[in-house]
Amino acid sequence: MSPNSLIFGVSRRTLLSALAILSVLPETLLPAGAQTVDAGGPLPSWNDGATKQAILNFVGTVTREGSPDFVPPAERIATFGNDGTLWCEHPMYVQLAFALDRVKAMAPLHPEWKDKQPFKAALEGDTKTLAESGERGLMELATVTHAGMTSNEFGKIVTDWIATARHPRFKRPYTELVYQPMLELLAYLRTKGFKTYITSGGGIEFIRPWSERVYGVPPEQVVGSSIKTKFQMRDGRPGLFRLPELNFVDDGAGKPVGINEHIGRRPIAAFGNSDGDLQMLQWTTMSGGVRLGLIVHHTDEAREYAYDRNTSFGRLDKALTGAAVNRWVVVDMKNDWKRIFAFE
């Protein structure tokens, strides 16, 4: 997702810096069929056509022993963005929705917020004023609502929120708004000897606790943005304490860096949906050999959302232009997917 796109008038990088500290979700919110491959054939929620065939051809080429393009299992690394690639990112990022709700939940203990910006704007849903507060305002919101506690304490807050929060349009838990075709793709790749990694601009601690249940991706195969934490003994007990200080933003040019630091191997397949995935796609597909780059293009306003170049969330501009030049596969969500969510 593009560091240059604007979210409430502030940069995507600023949002990620502010919200990288999110932690855990409950293990019970597994969408139906999230980790299965249909016995009747791979990718059952994908319509037959050029897009599906490109995926199958790539996998067949790199996994067929004797092929000149055969890739050993140890080198079969596939990386996936999260927001907009694996689950819904509109009308706003889930982590931003959490931050705004957190301000409202804490407001009774802070009566001064009703007259103090940017808290006043958050309480009133005044996005215009939130935008005018800029980077400093957003960081202030994040610092107050997300830091100054242990990881366990913050995890409990997030767990309680995710259990009751619902998407404003679909009225379902956010963890049910994962894309069934992408879940099938993850599972299919694993049956072919791939290791599947999440490489998200979102908070690494926000994704890791539930990624295995929802996506089949274990926590050690999640790469994301983070804040600094500090180990301390308090009252004779060890704890990791969250600090209001950025550690790493896994977005844009940071994604290849994060992949290299966490994985130690260059992917042979990368999947994204926005300009924030551009450098990951470039780094993957320009490494020589048979490689796959794929972009999820949101084109289905009826079943989900339709957006690309003109949006504050998940802007797809440079990467869409680069897809033709680099021969990346572009998924037309409306025409390539039989269904988007498991509950359809």
Language-model features: locations:
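A metal-dependent, Asp-based hydrolase signature
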Residues: 92, 97-176, 180
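Signal peptide processing junction and immediate N-terminal pro/mature segment
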Residues: 28-35
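Short loop/turn motifs at secondary-structure junctions and domain boundaries
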Residues: 68-72
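N-terminal post-signal-peptidase region of extra-cytosolic proteins
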Residues: 61-66
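Short, solvent-exposed loop/turn and secondary-structure capping segments
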Residues: 89-92, 97-100, 209-210, 283
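C-terminal cap/substrate-recognition subdomain and adjoining C-terminal extension
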Residues: 19, 36-42, 46, 53-56, ...
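Asp-based phosphoryl-transfer active-site loop
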Residues: 76-90, 281
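N-terminal secretory signal peptides
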Residues: 1-10, 18-26
